[in-house]
Amino acid sequence: MKLLHVFLLFLCFHLRFCKVTYTSQEDLVEKKCLAKKYTHLSCDKVFCQPWQRCIEGTCVCKLPYQCPKNGTAVCATNRRSFPTYCQQKSLECLHPGTKFLNNGTCTAEGKFSVSLKHGNTDSEGIVEVKLVDQDKTMFICKSSWSMREANVACLDLGFQQGADTQRRFKLSDLSINSTECLHVHCRGLETSLAECTFTKRRTMGYQDFADVVCYTQKADSPMDDFFQCVNGKYISQMKACDGINDCGDQSDELCCKACQGKGFHCKSGVCIPSQYQCNGEVDCITGEDEVGCAGFASVTQEETEILTADMDAERRRIKSLLPKLSCGVKNRMHIRRKRIVGGKRAQLGDLPWQVAIKDASGITCGGIYIGGCWILTAAHCLRASKTHRYQIWTTVVDWIHPDLKRIVIEYVDRIIFHENYNAGTYQNDIALIEMKKDGNKKDCELPRSIPACVPWSPYLFQPNDTCIVSGWGREKDNERVFSLQWGEVKLISNCSKFYGNRFYEKEMECAGTYDGSIDACKGDSGGPLVCMDANNVTYVWGVVSWGENCGKPEFPGVYTKVANYFDWISYHVGRPFISQYNV
């Protein structure tokens, strides 16, 4: 049976064949990941909303002035008008008591309400809504009702854990004279049902009306086969990792080895709804949900009367207005595959983020250009007392015959060592170099250099992903190399099996090949280990740090894990220089 589960997991990861049902929670979820209690506010796993930003792994509220200025006016429940939806949501994020009311200006009589009718308790019943510009209340259509809408409705009613996935509302025969109902569509993370899109539909009777049971902690005890959400809610383990946000805080979809049902599995271990694939919006932080899409699917709907604005479309529009950093995209793509140990030289343009750190003796280490005037490298490469002696050389592919017309030489203004760098253990082996600006210039000019992106999440790349290491290091016979070389290596899971307690999993990364045929070596230190996401955007995943017996089996190279230092880097260089997305 275990072999069967392993085979199914292989199909899910490599062939996206994930239409199976798992019998054990261990088959589905990563325990180490679950222990970190990720939710929809964990930017290691998900993108923050446009009115939030990522700080130390958590989506926190922006201030309203940090939102894009373009947009349509909206009204909040306190009758205050806001120039944009983003500004209203930003203030709501800071002060949760005030919610979205309607798109457009505020009116004295405008009111939105949600209530549950014909239930035995205040936590269950048929869902009835009064829209702002409608005179009467209407029931919600059952045909459009899902856990997304149910969770939002219950949250709007004050049930913080959303809807109950186990209990069902038993509806007896009712005499309701209504020929219409409201079709509602939510994304599932709205804080009020007013943010969802409503259209009017015809109905045949009360059987067509949506009902819900909201989750009440006192009414539920753990099941034998339960999954506990981060918010304290219990759901069946069979509802975890299926692409449906049953928990309401998304914690059941963020630590998944594979996906059940129709869920789409992101490499970062997140399950998203299958309809999010190829919908024009990147939902996987690794981007693969929008790769290979011929076009966006259009949905044909029956003739309806649209009653409210599409605020999810407005959210996407605001997201498109956020500044995006240009990094990690080369002007030319390499097509050859060479080894850094025993390989041939790189071509001009293959590695536009690679720099050489030179002192009086020659190239001592490599470095990575990350934008502005900033170079990322290894702390062990540098000495504070030699700051004025270092030079940064860019566009160097041949150290013996340098192309001086193309090479740009910059001098070092200052070096920032990680405050917890340990020269004995190589912990926190990372440093920043700020290059001097020429004259009165505001920035450094490196016309042929392209910055590598700085990763914000440790889940962007996984063991067995293929990445590239580069440098001017020695070959395995200790022979000096004078041309820039690069080679492909695979990320290797926890290297404690090779290096024991000298390997610190949180701040170190392992990469190489099990036969040692490709490796970084002496002289490559400080240089880049770069990985490309599904859209061929390059991230500096590691900084060459240390290793033993380069090019020998069972001695993979050890790198400083850059994602662990995103906040440290952004603190020193400024977040706009390294934040590719809204993070």
Swiss-Prot record:
SMART domains: FIMAC (SM00057), LDLa (SM00192), SR (SM00202), Tryp_SPc (SM00020). The active site is at 380 (charge relay system), 429 (charge relay system), 525 (charge relay system). It is an enzyme of class 3 (hydrolase). Disulfide bonds join 33-255, 43-54, 48-59, 61-93, 67-86, 75-106, 141-181, 154-214, 186-196, 229-247, 241-256, 259-271, 266-284, 278-293, 327-453, 365-381, 373-444, 467-531, 495-510, 521-550. Residues 114-212 form the SRCR domain. One of its GO terms (cellular component) is extracellular space. Ca(2+) 1 binds at residues 239, 242, 244, 246, 252-253. Heterodimer of a light and heavy chains; disulfide-linked. The fully processed and mature protein circulates as a zymogen, and is allosterically activated by substrate-induced remodeling of the active site. Interacts with C3b. Interacts with complement factor H. This is Complement factor I. It comes from Homo sapiens. The lineage of its organism: Eukaryota, Metazoa, Chordata, Craniata, Vertebrata.
